[in-house]
Amino acid sequence: MESNNSILGTTEMASSVEVRELLPFKTLTELNNALDNGLTDLPITCIAESVDYVYRGSEISAQKILLEKVDRDEQPRTLVCHDMKGGYLEDRFLSGSTSHDSYIFYHWSVVDIFVYFSHHFVTVPPCGWINAAHHHGVKVLGTVITEGNNDTWNTILISQEDVKKFADALILVAKCYQFEGWLLNIENKIKQEDIDNLIYFVKYLTENIHKEIENSEIIWYDSVTNIGELNWQNELNDNNKDFFLHCDGIFLNYNWTESRLSKSRIFAKELGRDIKDIYVGLDVWGRGCPGGGGFNSTYALDLIRKQGLSVAIFAPGWTHEYFGPSTFQILEDLFWAQLFPYLYVHVPIYEDETFKTSFCRGAGICYYYNGEEHFELYKINDESAHGKKAFYNLRMQQPQLSVPAPHSQFTRATQRTLIEDGENNDEVNNGQGDKDNDTNKTHTRIERIYENRKNIIRVCDNVVNVEEKLSAPDFNTFEFCDQFSYNGGGCLKLITTNDRLYHRLFLIHIDLKHNIQATIVYTELGSLMNESHKDPVLILGNDGDLKSILPYNSIRVNARWRKCIYLTNLKTVDEIGVSLKQCDCYLGEIILEKRDHCFEKTVVGNER
């Protein structure tokens, strides 16, 4: 592929279909050549608008029924910086791939900014990530990075005209691919005589991208100083303030202390800047970060929030990259459930627009359409055969839940030291070395044990064991099911043991000109062979007032799925939930839309 001619290349997937892929610009020459040849239009979704209030994650985690709306602008923000094995993996394919167990992200409700990160010069976010984030009202930034002995900035900073040319190129790329800005990460020395032009670059880029892209952002990474030295400050101070003052925010390196955060907060106020423009780095891999990252990332986040500062969560794909895909789903939910009390849920707007979700996360072992498996025609030894088609495509991700898996917060965390005999420890020895010297050696490893109301989780290195607690739970919860689906690659399993409590699912703002009609597609596996079923009760909230709505009609779609229609006299909704009798129920789809004309004269009498 000649990447200097276009940002798009081609590759061949398992199905022998040629598909386009999106790749970074690795050099300044590649970038300039691509702009000379013209950038290719991509299927990008515009960012969804959100209301001006948010909900505290702490209230949601505590299962509060009545949630307080707080001013979004007054709360610290959350930035997530993607860093997954260098980037541009299966996510680079515009048409997706069949690698269904690749890394995905779905906790969009608590994220304000998503940064796609790689170690290539100009990192353009793949359109699957842009679409998934935009659907949930989340801004997306690309990354500009130089490292080591890279001398690219020597060329860019020759003159202010060269600075403008590069900045204008970055603005054009962001505008063409409809993302909201850039993270600037310069991790190499800059000649001292070029510092003024570097500051000018930050200023010019920030001012002009604001003119071209609404609500755009330029964020400076705490690396090179105002004398051109590569010297991470881990705080806001005189050495990096000139960059901070000319952009929208600073991403502090991870090796900070509580006192440095306090000094940063005070200094920002002295400079007349909002303290929430400081994004404190939290490395999930723990590299020098207070608390050591991982499932103890809450230690760092608690210190950050005590100062009222924003957070930049770096490399949350740790749950997939370190532990592997087989345990990803449960570990991802556990990880974010711990952070949730320190985060804020923003609320997307659906104004005169249908809300529809099948809960698909953008991947699956098989694609389903209206409850039926989608098969693909394959050629095997010149014989035609049909088989299930696995898929990975973040552009297919549906609106995701606003809330974490209930009761997943840890109630207890302990650790113990495991002492292992060298003679029996094949994992350590790997059959190598002098066995006589190794037999008497012992090796120690730390096993960390976490408990919540549902499970006991044992973690030793990258090996995880999850045990269900023996006592029967007295609470309701849910989990994602990837074994079948109504539309897409999965559905939502609702586990109900207390039918007096409902399942909160979405915090949104739906405002229609007509009365709302809702649809729920569901199944109870125990009722597949007979007609015994218990239809879900739809819960809709409006400004703290919850209404329970019984189905107007219920029909069987196929052998597995049933569809319920709900009629309401509501036009505005800010919460969606479901109430069930004691059972395991799988939700395949939820739709809220204007009432169908055939029901226009129907009197609503099924609310309670």
Q: What does each of the following model-derived ranges do?
A:
Residues 2-89:
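N-terminal module-boundary/linker segments of secreted carbohydrate-active enzymes
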Residues 71-263:
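Chitinase-like catalytic core of GlcNAc-active glycosidases
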Residues 114, 423, 462, 492, ...:
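Extra-cytoplasmic beta-strand recognition segments
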Residues 284-421:
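Substrate-binding cleft of secreted/luminal carbohydrate-active enzymes
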Residues 474-502:
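Short carbohydrate-recognition loop motifs
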Residues 530-543:
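Short, surface-exposed beta-strand/strand-loop-strand elements in extracellular ectodomains
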Residues 544-571:
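Extracellular carbohydrate recognition and processing domains
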Residues 583-607:
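Exposed low-complexity, polar/acidic, P/S/T/G-rich flexible segments that act as propeptides
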